[in-house]
Regions:
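Catalytic cores of the polymerase beta-like nucleotidyltransferase superfamily
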Residues: 1-385
């Protein structure tokens, strides 16, 4: 029901990755159809989709459990350094011109024919990260592009930073303060997950920029070098662990970071487990089986592994004892209190309520204190007072 001019093309990251011989995770598509036409086609073909990004022209189709973001061509009507107000378009060149870097302004039809109005393919080949058109204009449309520039530079550049780009970023860096903390953290996550992170330790300009944007990140260079030196000992670290290596110190730096940035409850728990263990304590005295068993019980296995990895990374010479502890706790299940409320009620005739809770807490405290061992006699003594 649509004319031969209606079209859909692959766009952006998936093409950039293919041309750079990388694994493709997500496939994004662009179309000159408007969102209502896209949803009509998907309905006719019984393809599930959702419209959470429809105000920006994006509909997400789900095929064989894979998500495909289909976005209508757009042009910017208004930008304020954080958001763009867009109008839907039929013009592929205008859609390309609103993107940040040449290597992201690539399109290909379903036969693989490339539409590359800003020579992004050539920039991938020579390893050059170039803003489309005027760098200052691009940055002032959305100041997050300063942080995105660092990420793409690490992943794709084989050339040094251009002097005019350095100058433009330095002039406009203060604009990053209007970008939402969630967007900044999301971009930092992508950056720290980069397999080119080692390159960052040699890039003073990028380190200085990161330190300005995220002043809570300490010792970026030394942390990356320490990870590189001990890489053979570990599985790959996740974003949160690398972040915590840079944030946790003897001060209240972590508290300040968690106040500013919204991370999940699960990740906060990991952060506090490491921080409580290391912050202002003599770690060599506390790093023993009893203390680690307590962490295992209260925080879970991941927290123990984090604490041991943290110590290994922060220590110049790796102690073999730490490596054996790491192996031991990878295979250890958290301890379980050998008596529960039901048994207390039946064995000791304690009624349900506050007294039962208090008694369970006393038993638990004694059990933890005795390295998670307690006899029936000890339980009897606690209950009978």
């Amino acid at each position: 029901s649509y004319s031969y001019e209606s079209e859909i093309r692959y766009v952006g990251g998936c093409l950039r990755k293919i041309l750079n011989n990388e694994k493709v995770d997500d496939i994004d598509l662009a179309t000159n159809l408007n969102p209502s036409e896209v949803s009509e086609i998907l309905k006719k073909n019984n393809i599930n989709f959702y419209e959470s990004g429809i105000e920006h022209g994006t509909i997400t189709a789900i095929i064989d459990d894979h998500k495909f973001e289909i976005t209508t061509l757009r042009e910017d009507i208004f930008t304020d350094g954080r958001h763009a107000k867009v109008e839907f378009s039929k013009d592929w060149k205008k859609d390309a011109s609103r993107r940040d870097f040449t290597i992201n302004s690539l399109y290909a039809d379903l036969d693989g024919n490339l539409f590359d109005p800003y020579n992004g393919k050539k920039d991938i080949e020579i390893g050059q990260v170039s803003f489309i058109g005027d760098a200052e204009k691009r940055i002032r449309e959305d100041y997050l592009r300063i942080l995105r520039y660092i990420r793409f530079f690490l992943n794709y550049s084989k050339q040094p930073h251009k002097e005019e780009v350095i100058k433009t970023i330095k002039i406009n860096i203060s604009g990053i303060s209007i970008v939402s903390k969630d967007r900044l953290l999301d971009e930092l996550k992508k950056l720290l997950k980069s397999n080119q992170l080692e390159k960052l330790s040699k890039d003073k300009f990028s380190i200085d920029l990161l330190s300005l944007i995220f002043p809570e990140l300490k010792n970026i260079k030394s942390v990356i070098n320490a990870i590189k030196d001990k890489k053979k000992l570990f599985v790959e670290f996740d974003f949160i662990f690398i972040l915590l290596l840079m944030v946790i110190d003897e001060t209240d730096n972590l508290e300040y970071f968690l106040y500013k940035y919204n991370i999940s409850k699960k990740d906060k728990k990991r952060a506090y487990a490491i921080n409580n263990f290391y912050n202002g304590k003599n770690v060599s005295k506390t790093l023993n089986e009893l203390s680690l068993n307590k962490v295992l019980y209260y925080y879970g296995k991941q927290a123990v592994i984090d604490i041991l990895n943290f110590k290994i990374i922060k220590t110049k010479k790796v102690d073999k004892k730490l490596l054996s502890l790491l192996e031991f706790y990878r295979n250890k299940t958290p301890p379980r209190l050998p008596i529960g409320a039901d048994l207390l009620m039946t064995r000791y005739k304690i009624p349900e309520g506050r007294q039962l809770g208090s008694m369970l807490k006393l038993i638990e405290d004694e059990w933890v204190r005795n390295n998670f061992e307690i006899s029936d006699k000890q339980i009897d003594n606690i209950v009978k007072g």
